[in-house]
Amino acid sequence: SKQILILMTVILVIILGGCTYVLNKTSGQIYEQMSQMAQLYAQELDNRFLRISRNLFSTIMDTNETNSTFWGNVNLMKNGDYSEYAIGKLREEYFSSAWEYGTEYRIFLYTHDTDKLYQLSLSSDGNYTMSSDIAASIREQIDKLDEKTYAVKRKWDVLECDNEVYICKIAQKNGIALGCIVNVKSILEPFSKLSLGKHGYVSLVDQDEVCIGMLDQSGIISEPQSMNTKNTYTIRQGLSRAPFEIRIGISLGGVLSLMAGSLLGMTVLIFMILIMSGILLFHVYSNIMKPLKVFTQ
């Protein structure tokens, strides 16, 4: 019986060692997959930001304004009798942006002469409405920009309105401002279904290391808190087209949750191996060792 106990212990140690190796290998693969996912999403965001910036820049800085559809409609707006017609035409120009960028990216136009702001792209509700608070925040941001060519080259800025955080890109020329605004919630939303554990999070951090948006297991946090990096494995992925960085913190609970299938499979495997080993050893003891012991006595 002593030999059987030793043999069972050796088998158990070998099994546990193998399981530990598999778990470490699996957790490493999970971290690598999460890192690749963050990289792919950052590339998608960079591509989207680049296309939006190019559209704003090329449209507002069109040197041949006489042949520009955009400037033709903008100039038509100066005639009060045709302003509604001109806005309708501009909205037709940006109708496809809802599919190209997503309805969460809202294109807007602001005219200094009339102090009016119009949303040109379609919202998710099928309208062109923008809250007065957001419009006021955009006006304040436009006032901060100098009326110079380099203003269109500035990177995405952060706006706060009604406990919500937005990022905004604005290009302006000759008293006309053309821009795009998006809620940070929409940027973090694709990560909402990830299982990151109790202390896990996804955040958007600016170049000053300030967290401007955070998502944890409870959902989007309107007032981002300090990130718990002690109990998490942190993945950092910077954006090249905007001064922000995506950070993903995965806690031990999140890793175990993502490894649930592997853990369940290994538990069943260990249980089956132990049962089979026990049956085999009992058979060896009953049919070989016990008769041999009786014979030697």
Predicted regions and their residues:
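GAF sensory domains
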Residues: Q119-M130, A151, Y201-D206, V210-I235
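Extracytoplasmic/periplasmic sensory segments of membrane signal-transduction proteins
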Residues: E32-I138
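Short, hydrophobic beta-strand elements of compact beta-sandwich sensory domains
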Residues: K169-S186, K230-F271
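Membrane-proximal alpha-helical signal-transduction linkers
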Residues: F282-Q297
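Selective detector of the "anchor" transmembrane alpha-helix that sits immediately C-terminal
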Residues: M266-H283
